[in-house]
Amino acid sequence: PEAWPAVKAILQDIAAKLEDGTPCCDWVGEDGAGHFVKMVHNGIEYGDMQLICEAYQIMRDLLGMTADEIHQVFADWNEGELNSYLIEISRDIMAFKDEDGEPLVEKILDTAGQKGTGKWTGITALHLGIPLTLIGEAVFSRCLSAKKEERV
């Protein structure tokens, strides 16, 4: 806590900013409060990634869209209110081709690991009685994904 006043201006100057200029960096409290905030942030990111994965699967498997068509959908989404780093990199991944000119996305191993922050967010939500179903399902999907040999 004593160091915050000394570094606040530096950190807030280099931090991302909201549209109104408010820095996306602030002191959130003592005793691991910042770590808790980061854990929740990562849990939300798990949910976002799960939504992106499910949207991709629906477009590819149900709608029969090509990687180029899916790329365009993500590009359109990234121009509107869904604009985000995760949508942007999903858009970019859809455009990558391998040395044969085929979509690289189809050659990426379909397993996902985890470091635990999504799981910790879900466990904390359960302890607090907060329904956090998207993050919980995202964690379960990652657990299933990691067991490729058992699920395929």
Annotate each language-model stretch with its function:
Residues 47-51, 117:
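Catalytic-loop motifs flanking and including active-site residues across diverse enzymes
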Residues 103-152:
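A conserved active-site cap/scaffold subdomain adjacent to cofactor or substrate pockets
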Residues 39, 54, 120-121:
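A general alpha-helix detector
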Residues 1-18, 39, 50, 58-63:
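Rossmann-like NAD(P)H-binding beta-loop-alpha module
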Residues 15-46, 63-82, 86-87, 91, ...:
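Conserved Rossmann-fold dehydrogenase catalytic segment
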Residues 4-7, 70, 135:
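Small-residue helix-packing motif on alpha-helices
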